[in-house]
Amino acid sequence: MNKIEREKGPWPANNLLSSVQAWVLERLGGHPEDREMRSVTRMMLDAVSGLDRGQRIVNDWKANESALDALAQWCVRFKKGEPIQYILGATSFFGVSLKIDARALIPRPETEELIRHLLDQQSTSESLRVLDVGTGSGCMALAWKSQRPQDEVTGVDASHEALSLARENGVDLGFEDLNWELVDVLNPSPFDAVSKAKKGWDVVMSNPPYIPISERQSMENRVILHEPSSALFVSDQDPLSFYVTIASGCLKEGWLTAGGWLGFECHEEFASAVEALLSDQPEWRAIRLLKDLQGAPRMVLAQKK
């Protein structure tokens, strides 16, 4: 690791955990009551030490010179606006440790909730076929596989770069039997690569792009300057395009089996419209509009009759 100039100001008085923690927080420009900066500090210390907070205390962890250099570099990058997950090259999703970088969107807690709700609908221990549309880093597909290793899981995405990251994550986690396919869901024949299967899927789940492009100007630079725009934004004129295409495919193309579940993550302003889209189609039942932990309408689930 290349050393960098350590900026002006004091370095930690010593290499003890308490001193290093306070020093990182100060370099980030935070204060002890700043929850976000405390969280970023904890993530940096977790990464540089290879230990969680409790383990650092129990093991009386001390920072060596290499750790201090790494922390200094990370602080500089974070203050320039880079997401902490990209800086560390890792994130946690549904208890699964994932490699993450600018090839794919950073997984969010709301998406964990979608996985949890869909898993709750599965009462059989038999193998299911599961399709993740817009898989990105593979977070949903891999989280599902971690909970139901007997299932056959396929992740599709329009991005070569995202799929390469998903494959790497699958290998790292020992889930090399997952299927990863390059598919642009908005193409006229979006599932040519995967619709050759003899039967449909038992679960179709998707966290598609859903932010209208007009909202870009009000979003944080940490998001819009670093995360892939293609995974974030849709046109203002047709914000439900992915939902319409996927729901139609589940019915008209037989992607979803009878009794199978469809699960969407949605923009809170359009969740009701997605619910209405499915409610207008008599082939669906048990349609549910679910709120996230902040109380915002965020997920729509439905079962095919």
Question: Where in this protein do the model-derived segments appear?
Answer:
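Generic structural signal for secondary-structure transition and capping sites
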Residues: 53, 80-84, 123, 228, ...
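A generic alpha-helix signature
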Residues: 11, 15, 19, 36, ...
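N-terminal auxiliary segments of SAM/dcSAM-dependent transferases
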Residues: 2-88
